[in-house]
Structures are given as structure tokens and as C-alpha cells.
Regions:
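N-terminal interaction/assembly modules
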Residues: 1-135, 140-142, 146-166
Length: 166
């Protein structure tokens, strides 16, 4: 599972939150496939490999990417039951085993962000999750992820952010 997110020139690099979301999704995906528990040791091993693979240096940009990924993973772990229940509630017609591991990991990260990061508008979480799905899955999965996350957005007890008025 490789994406070229960090191999770009600095001016073209993706926002560190985007890279953090991808790292979190990749780590959750890896833990799902290996049935490994989330731990500092497995996270550090993953980061070592991901940092090399994606050329994430120890500079401020790389550090910010890792920090955001860690916050998302912590939210995924601490809120795991609520996230899984949310997925079950909004994906009523989908048996959990029908959701691919990549799409499930992407949903978990996006839902964790929507539930726990009030400074991030839900539409941003949705757009980012759909973009990540497009990079790691397929177009049909994009529609599925978008539909699930829009349904989650409808259940949130958060005020919508207003756009800037001209």
C-alpha cells in the first residue's frame, strides 16, 4: 500500500493532516490484517517503515504528520466501540465482512475525526476520506464511503460551519 504523498517537492506536499490521516489509515489497516493490537511498539515499527517508504523526514513537516496520525489513532482506539457501533448503525444493509479492510480503516479514521475533532468540519473529514479511498480503493468504494460518512454527519450534534460571507 504505497502512495506518493510525501515524495513530492515541498511546495507540492499534501497538508500534514492529510498525510496524518493516511498514516493512521495505513496503520489501522495493518493492525487489522495482522490482528495485532495497537501499541507503541507496533506504531513505532510502522512509522520507521512508513517514514522510509514515504520519505518523511524528522523535520517539522514529518513531525506534524506523525503527531496528527497519533491523535487519530488514539481517538480510534479510545472510541473504538462507538465508532464500530456508528458504522453498524449507518451501514444497516451492509454486513461488516462486506466492507473491505481498507475502506473500514478509512471509515474508522474519518468517523474518529468527526466525533472527536470539533475544529475539523465534518465535510473536510468526508472529503479527505473520499480522496484517500480514491487513492487506495476504487470508485465504487468512494460512493460507499461518501454515503456512510454523510449519514454519520447527519447524526452529529454539531452546528454546521457557515461559509464566509462576501
Amino acid at each position: 500500500m504505497t502512495n506518493e504523498f510525501a515524495n513530492n517537492a515541498p511546495a507540492e506536499r499534501l497538508h500534514n493532516k492529510r498525510v496524518g490521516r493516511e498514516l493512521a489509515m495505513q496503520y489501522i489497516f495493518q493492525c487489522t490484517l495482522t490482528e495485532e493490537k495497537f501499541s507503541a511498539a507496533s506504531w513505532n515499527a510502522f512509522l520507521e517503515q512508513a517514514s522510509e517508504e514515504h520519505n518523511l523526514s524528522t523535520n517539522r513537516y514529518g513531525r506534524k504528520c506523525r503527531e496528527y496520525a497519533e491523535k487519530l489513532i488514539e481517538a480510534c482506539v479510545s472510541d473504538s466501540e462507538r465508532i464500530e457501533e456508528t458504522i453498524r448503525n449507518v451501514a444497516r444493509n451492509w454486513a461488516p465482512e462486506r466492507i473491505s479492510a481498507v475502506d473500514h480503516a478509512t471509515l474508522k479514521v474519518a468517523i474518529a475525526e468527526m466525533l472527536n475533532f470539533p475544529d475539523v468540519p465534518p465535510v473536510v473529514s468526508i472529503d479527505e476520506a473520499v480522496a484517500i479511498t480514491r487513492d487506495y480503493s476504487d470508485e465504487r468504494a468512494c460512493d460507499f464511503v461518501n454515503g456512510i460518512l454523510n449519514a454519520v454527519k447527519g447524526t452529529l450534534n454539531r452546528p454546521e460551519r457557515e461559509g464566509i460571507k462576501a
